[in-house]
């Protein structure tokens, strides 16, 4: 097991590359080696490599080949006219702690690969062609991408095709641009887990959506924050699909836009859509499809979701389907269902036990408190800090700050919560002020915030815009911590100038 060091500034390809003082200079030199299981290739922080990195050899499950970084400073950067990192047929590979930007193709491309992990990789400005996903895997097995960031790319954020075993965990995608770009596009794949991601298509120059799943099998999409786009989650022709506990908003590009949609491109069966907060968009859950197609839509269960600020109904069913819409919470002013008469008369899609409330935010805060209390009671041996997603909705503005508290729906085992980080900055004893896309916000350690809208920054069109701020909390002594996001939704139709 050998560690090879590569430094674009001080290295030389005449060196042996086996210690930091005798590092190689180029990735092509590494490619000339026959890497063995357990070997590592570490790129010096601060280095810039203007070449594609081809991974040709495989590790083993117990001794993967690792591509990472060393030293201090900013992450090493790979630029390339082709892909950033490219591999065919290699197995048992770990890629971590790098940045890939300004590449002509994909940031990372893997074809017919097995057991890959991509961790803490920053990918930006990829794809001179819109056909290239920033992270692309095809015909592969067991691929995990976690804690990575994709931003301002031309093409899909993730393009996954015919992969058995996919995990996308705790990633961020912002602005996947292009005429066919989604934050995540996944076709003909199975055993899928998409969890804990923040995917934002609010400012993307794309008519598409956030997550597009085509013919998924055994898929779970949970605990994500999905914002913007023509749709939130399009899950077509799937088998055994769970979509739960997501925050989905800002999907209002078209009259047909939806938070969750299914029924197109083939038969769909066994969907569980539950625990989601669906708001600030057009349709909620849309069970639909093309006219004349004979697709079946079987056992579609929509339950325990919360719907508010929708211009269309929380549930739309206009094609033959069987299932149920039960125990959902719908804010007054939002239409509950739009079910075609033929389907209603067939009694194949039942509606029961749903609730209408005056204020969804109050209901959500109460539910979060109950869940936190129950979690603490049942798991005293495993204390933790839990942060919950926060929303600020601005319908009118008179120049005064819009106020709230980030911590009131969070919880900790010792009943102490402190706001430590907001955006990319630490929160000091005098608080912190940041300037956002549409206004400025001041926060303090107690979680209080004051958002002041700057109407001069708003676009000229009507409708909605939004921006998000990440934040981190702990229990006062940093033994336990968690993080989440505040999303500010601005309804421009009602603003007072």
Segments from the language model and where they lie:
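Right-handed parallel beta-helix/beta-solenoid
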Residues: 1-28, 45-47, 70
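Detector for repetitive beta-architecture
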Residues: 3, 38-40, 46, 64, ...
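Right-handed parallel beta-helix/beta-spiral solenoid domain characteristic of secreted/periplasmic
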Residues: 24, 42, 49-51, 58-108, ...
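Short glycine/acidic-rich loop motifs that flank beta-strands on beta-rich extracellular proteins
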Residues: 51-54, 79-84, 103-109, 127-134, ...
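Acidic, glycine- and Ser/Thr-rich low-complexity intrinsically disordered tracts
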Residues: 321-381
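Extracellular ectodomain surface segments
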Residues: 381-434
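Acidic, turn/loop-rich segments in luminal/extracellular domains of secretory-pathway
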Residues: 431-493
């Amino acid at each position: 097991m050998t560690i090879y060091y590569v430094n674009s500034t001080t290295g030389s390809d005449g060196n042996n590359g086996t210690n930091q003082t005798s590092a190689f200079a180029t990735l092509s030199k590494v490619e000339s080696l026959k890497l063995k299981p357990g070997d590592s290739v570490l790129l010096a922080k601060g280095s810039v490599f203007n070449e594609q990195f081809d991974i040709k050899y495989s590790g083993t499950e117990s001794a993967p080949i690792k591509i990472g970084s060393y030293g201090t400073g900013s992450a090493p950067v790979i630029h390339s006219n082709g892909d950033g990192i490219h591999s065919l047929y290699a197995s048992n590979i770990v890629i971590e702690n790098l940045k890939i930007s300004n590449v002509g193709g994909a940031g990372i491309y893997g074809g017919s690969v097995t057991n890959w992990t991509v961790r803490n990789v920053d990918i930006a400005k990829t794809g001179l062609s819109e056909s290239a996903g920033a992270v692309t895997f095809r015909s592969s097995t067991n691929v995990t991408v976690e804690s990575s960031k994709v931003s301002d790319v031309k093409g899909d954020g993730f393009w996954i095709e015919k992969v058995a075993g996919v995990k996308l965990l705790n990633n961020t995608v912002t602005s996947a641009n292009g005429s066919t770009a989604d934050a995540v596009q996944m076709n003909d794949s199975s055993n899928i887990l998409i969890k804990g991601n923040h995917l934002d298509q609010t400012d993307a120059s794309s008519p598409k959506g956030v997550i597009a799943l085509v013919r998924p099998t055994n898929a779970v999409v949970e605990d994500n924050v999905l914002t913007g786009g023509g749709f939130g989650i399009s899950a077509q022709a799937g088998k055994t699909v769970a979509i739960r506990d997501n925050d989905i908003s800002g999907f209002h590009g078209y009259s047909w836009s939806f938070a969750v949609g299914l029924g197109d491109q083939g038969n769909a069966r066994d969907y569980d859509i539950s625990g989601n907060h669906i708001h600030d968009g057009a349709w909620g859950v849309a069970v639909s499809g093309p006219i004349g197609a004979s697709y079946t839509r079987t056992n579609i269960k929509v339950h325990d979701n919360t719907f508010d600020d929708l211009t269309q109904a929380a549930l739309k069913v206009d094609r033959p389907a069987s299932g149920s819409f039960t125990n959902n919470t719908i804010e007054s002013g939002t239409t509950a269902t739009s079910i075609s008469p033929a389907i209603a008369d067939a009694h194949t899609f039942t509606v029961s036990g749903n609730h209408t409330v005056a204020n969804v935010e109050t209901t959500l805060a109460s539910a979060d408190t109950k869940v936190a209390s129950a979690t603490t009671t049942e798991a005293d041996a495993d204390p933790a800090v839990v942060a919950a997603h926060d929303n600020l909705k601005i319908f009118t503005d008179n120049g005064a700050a819009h106020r709230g508290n980030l911590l009131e729906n969070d919880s900790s085992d010792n009943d102490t919560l402190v706001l430590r980080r907001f955006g990319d900055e630490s929160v000091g004893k005098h608080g912190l002020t940041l300037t956002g896309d549409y206004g400025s916000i001041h926060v303090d350690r107690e979680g209080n915030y004051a958002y002041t809208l700057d109407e001069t920054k708003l676009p000229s069109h009507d409708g909605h815009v939004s921006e998000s701020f990440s934040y981190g909390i702990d229990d006062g002594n940093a033994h336990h911590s968690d993080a989440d996001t505040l999303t500010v939704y601005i309804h421009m139709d009602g603003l007072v100038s």
